[in-house]
Structure formats: C-alpha cells, structure tokens
C-alpha cells in the first residue's frame, strides 16, 4: 500500500538509510552503506545527458579498481545483456524512455551485484516496453545468478517477475501477507496459472487495505 514504507525499506537494504533498530545482512555481511555488491535502480534513470550509452554504463567503474581493459569488457557485456549494442556510442538524449531505462539497468549490471534493488523502475513506461523489460530483467537475473528485490504497485508485475510476493500495509509499515510464486518460465499473463496467482494476490492486496496494526497488550 502507498505510504507503508516500501521505498524506505528498499533504501535500508541498499545501505542508503540506517534502520532505527536491527541490521541487514547479505551472506553474513552487514549492509551499512552503498557498495558494488548491492545496487539500486530508481524510478527515473538518472543518466548523464552529455554522455554516450557506453560512458553512462561505465561511469561507476571509473571510481573503482578496474583496469581500462576490464572496464571496457564489463561495459560491452552489460550493453549486450540489455540489447543496446547498436546504440552504444549514441548520446543517451537520443534514446527512448525504455532504452534509457535499459541503460540504467546496464549501469547496475556492470557492477556484477549479488543483489539488485528496483524501486518501480518501469512504472512510467508504456505497457509493451514495461512487459519486455520485466521479462528481460528476470531472465538476466537467472542467467547471471543474482537476486532481485523490487517494489511495485503492479500485481501483474509481481507475478511475472517474482518468486515471492510480500504485501505491506499500515504506517509504519508491516508485512501482512506473503505468497510464494512457483511458476515456470517464461510466464505469460494469459496463462491460467498466472491468472490464478494474480487472483490470489489481488485478494490479499484488497484485504491489506483494511489492515489495522493490533494494539499492544497491556497489563492490568
């Protein structure tokens, strides 16, 4: 639900915000600040408009220990993964909104993260482009072997992209429902199994609209 802290939770997972209590661990490592192992992709691509596609994709590597040869190899692979090879030397201002989001995705992938965090990055795109990117991101994650945590208000997107859906509600937010999404790939919106899970998830989402956090028990 809106305002329940989904994006705040994602920022904590990215090390951008510190939790008021507890800590976040990735394979035993505490996440306390941004790092190449966990990368966040935002709603807007936030590209450098004066740079080419390749330059934008490789900008994060310029602050690290990577050699020129390794940087070029990583950039080339990331651009290939998002299918932008023909536009590698184009200025990003010349690209469509969907292509710019692919550049932002490649910029995240070039770091070879273990965890990719997505904050509704496809919400402003047209339906066709959004559907294509949803499938591509899931496919790339499976091929490269990294995990994804993404925030969405789109139930179809949750079923198409996810292995588990977590519904939050209330303010401050609480996890009120969880649902495993055990479906084979590729997933199509018209598949009966996809539609069945979508219906279950929609029911949970509607129940969350009426969620009220239980009052703490008090002693007489």
Q: What are the residue ranges of the model-derived segments?
A:
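Helix-to-loop junction immediately C-terminal to a conserved catalytic motif
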Residues: 14
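Conserved ABC transporter NBD signature motif
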Residues: 22-34
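Short coil-to-helix segment of the ABC ATPase nucleotide-binding domain corresponding to the Q-loop/switch region
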Residues: 51-58
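Conserved ABC ATPase "signature" region
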Residues: 58, 62, 69-87, 139
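Conserved ABC ATPase signature
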Residues: 91-95, 99
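Hydrophobic anchor residue at the start of the ABC signature
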Residues: 105
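Conserved catalytic motifs of ABC-family nucleotide-binding domains
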Residues: 112
């Amino acid at each position: 639900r809106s305002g329940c802290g989904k994006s705040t939770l994602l920022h904590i997972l990215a090390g951008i915000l510190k939790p008021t209590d507890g800590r976040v661990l990735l394979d035993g490592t505490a996440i306390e600040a941004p790092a190449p192992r966990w990368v966040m992709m935002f709603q807007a691509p936030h590209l450098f408009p004066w740079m080419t596609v390749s330059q934008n994709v490789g900008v994060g590597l310029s602050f690290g220990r990577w050699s020129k040869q390794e940087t070029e190899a990583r950039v080339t692979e990331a651009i290939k993964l998002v299918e932008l090879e023909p536009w590698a030397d184009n200025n990003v201002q010349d690209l469509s909104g969907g292509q710019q989001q692919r550049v932002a995705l490649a910029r995240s992938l070039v770091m070879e993260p273990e965890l990719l965090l997505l904050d509704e990055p496809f919400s402003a795109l047209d339906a066709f482009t959004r559907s294509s990117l949803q499938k591509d991101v899931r496919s790339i994650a499976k091929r490269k072997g990294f995990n994804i945590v993404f925030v969405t208000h789109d139930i179809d997107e949750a079923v198409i992209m996810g292995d588990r859906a977590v519904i939050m509600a209330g303010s401050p937010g609480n996890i009120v429902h969880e649902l495993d999404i055990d479906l084979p790939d590729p997933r199509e919106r018209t598949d009966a199994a996809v539609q069945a899970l979508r219906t279950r998830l929609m029911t949970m989402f509607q129940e969350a609209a009426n969620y009220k956090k239980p009052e703490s028990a008090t002693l007489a």
